[in-house]
Amino acid sequence: MIIRSPEPKVQILADPEVKILVDRDPIKTSFEQWAKPGHFSRTIAKGPDTTTWIWNLHADAHDFDSHTSDLEEISRKVFSAHFGQLSIIFLWLSGMYFHGARFSNYEAWLNDPTHIGPSAQVVWPIVGQEILNGDVGGGFRGIQITSGFFQIWRASGITSELQLYCTAIGALVFAGLMLFAGWFHYHKAAPKLAWFQDVESMLNHHLAGLLGLGSLSWARHQVHVSLPINQFLNAGVDPKEIPLPHEFILNRDLLAQLYPSFAEGATPFFTLNWSKYADFLTFRGGLDPLTGGLWLTDIAHHHLAIAILFLIAGHMYRTNWGIGHGIKDILEAHKGPFTGQGHKGLYEILTTSWHAQLSINLAMLGSLTIVVAQHMYSMPPYPYLATDYATQLSLFTHHMWIGGFLIVGAAAHAAIFMVRDYDPTTRYNDLLDRVLRHRDAIISHLNWVCIFLGFHSFGLYIHNDTMSALGRPQDMFSDTAIQLQPVFAQWIQNTHALAPGTTAPGATASTSLTWGGGDLVAVGNKVALLPIPLGTADFLVHHIHAFTIHVTVLILLKGVLFARSSRLIPDKANLGFRFPCDGPGRGGTCQVSAWDHVFLGLFWMYNSISVVIFHFSWKMQSDVWGTINDQGVVTHITAGNFAQSSITINGWLRDFLWAQASQVIQSYGSSLSAYGLFFLGAHFVWAFSLMFLFSGRGYWQELIESIVWAHNKLKVAPATQPRALSIVQGRAVGVTHYLLGGIATTWAFFLARIIAVG
């Protein structure tokens, strides 16, 4: 049985020279229309009969596919919404900078970042809550922040609160501009579909403009503003005495005093004598021992190099001049011995299905965000970031969660593409078709891998718990008994530690101190970073990571590959992206929609990321973070207990969760007490989710009808008829509170602990 999706409006361009790319005044600006709730849907616009109406209103407001099937109109709405999103981002950034200007101890921190903690929030003395204003040093009382903004401001060369005010106002102006642009490009000059589908032009502009010129302008700012200002700060000059940014930009002699090559201007550039610039464009590797961050001259060099690459990349694609790559040609030439037609037809998919496009972008951005999390601690980019343990832990945790959500989003939109945009009648023997035809083999093999990893990884722990319980430490898997050393990881560490002098002859240290070989870097008697030893304990928990990630992928991929049909429900595509069951009279067909796979995938994503951040938090406290005395002896926060304690489940519960929860549990009466309240409240939110996840719709409908009866008795019954949440709505509310409660609990646990001991 072939299920046809509605035909999308395809308009692939033959002639690249398109003249008029916008429609003028396509849709009038109508406040009357906006004031009508649900104006985008005939059904919802009629107003509420039952309380389900408010749920449908929220579910469909941004589901532009449900408003119209016209791809051009959908594209315009998405484009306009992007400007709204940018406006919110600028507004948020403005708020951050304003807090730094108005409520923070930034200038004091700048003078003494090793003894003063960053704070940008002071609680008003209402009901005694001023207890939350802890002493962060230098006589300032406020809430310690862990966002890393102070470090990034210092790296940018911001030396006063006035500069923060100006930036905050600038961001507000940009927020207004973005709002205007969102309105203008939907109501006044809306791009045609052809403009959205002109991928070569888009690639050229994004690569050369956003990434190329963006990196180049940041490199320019670093060289002309950040480097000299940080040079002065590092030398102990009072921030008020340092020349202002524009003085460095306008007066070359000022820069030449710090970096002699500036005296020669652009001559070395045009005479190809580039090594002259090595005083401010370096290739050192390792960390600046003064600040514990990457060398800012290395970072400037990096952005200059990246800019060149992206500027070249932005000239590679064929637009009006008949030279360069065409994406369609590249994709259609992409065939292998086992891939049939290869990527034939993929160009049409990616230019007519924004869900398919978004799915790929989310998968890549999610992976990249997780890569950022790994690099923020192993290559700390900003001055004094590495010794601010609370910020390090927060940045790692934040980027891991964000990456996890983005990757689940990738699966969600891939499934929506399969249901709404995929047309099986036009796709034959291309890569996607071939994947779909052997999906049973893929999923069953992946399932086998999950079972194997699950039993073996947990089996190793259970073995250790059993041996430990029976008093047989000599029979445990550990660094002191039966060793399971991560030899491949150790080999990679060693290879990178040896790289300076061989693969990178100019570098004096490896890319990251964590590889080994180097000495530790300490700032103000606190460890910034040192070689991280890997042993049996890491080998065990890494296999738990492998297990949880593979199960997440199994659930999400099954949802995508079986989104349109399965043996159980051959006509699944007709039921849509989310549905509770395959109608009455077909038992055992509930919770099979693509949406339900996303729902289940979220729980396993939560499992995966939780284990990762727990591993990171304990490993760093045990083997990296700590203090160093004058004799060079390092005392770690948990005294290196990870290797011996984390090899049993009991050890994780006793020496990590319970032992490190003491700070949050005992926080009442101290400046950390808000975390104690959050810890309690977030546990409650998490438990509240179970009420939605464990009970059925009928239970609530019965309860509601009793309550409505009571209201009728008292003649206070509402006109809108109350309804229980649908099955899908209940699960959505459940998973939202589960994740919100779980993440906020972890946040309170981590921060109370690390602010107290870090």
Curated annotation (Swiss-Prot):
Gene3D superfamilies: Photosystem I PsaA/PsaB (1.20.1130.10). InterPro entries: PSI_PsaA, PSI_PsaA/B, PSI_PsaA/B_CS, PSI_PsaA/B_sf. GO terms for molecular function: 4 iron, 4 sulfur cluster binding; chlorophyll binding; electron transfer activity; magnesium ion binding; oxidoreductase activity. Chlorophyll a' binds at residue 683. The PsaA/B heterodimer binds the P700 chlorophyll special pair and subsequent electron acceptors. PSI consists of a core antenna complex that captures photons, and an electron transfer chain that converts photonic excitation into a charge separation. The eukaryotic PSI reaction center is composed of at least 11 subunits. PsaA and PsaB bind P700, the primary electron donor of photosystem I (PSI), as well as the electron acceptors A0, A1 and FX. PSI is a plastocyanin-ferredoxin oxidoreductase, converting photonic excitation into a charge separation, which transfers an electron from the donor P700 chlorophyll pair to the spectroscopically characterized acceptors A0, A1, FX, FA and FB in turn. Oxidized P700 is reduced on the lumenal side of the thylakoid membrane by plastocyanin. This is Photosystem I P700 chlorophyll a apoprotein A1. It comes from Pisum sativum (Garden pea). The lineage of its organism: Eukaryota, Viridiplantae, Streptophyta, Embryophyta, Tracheophyta.
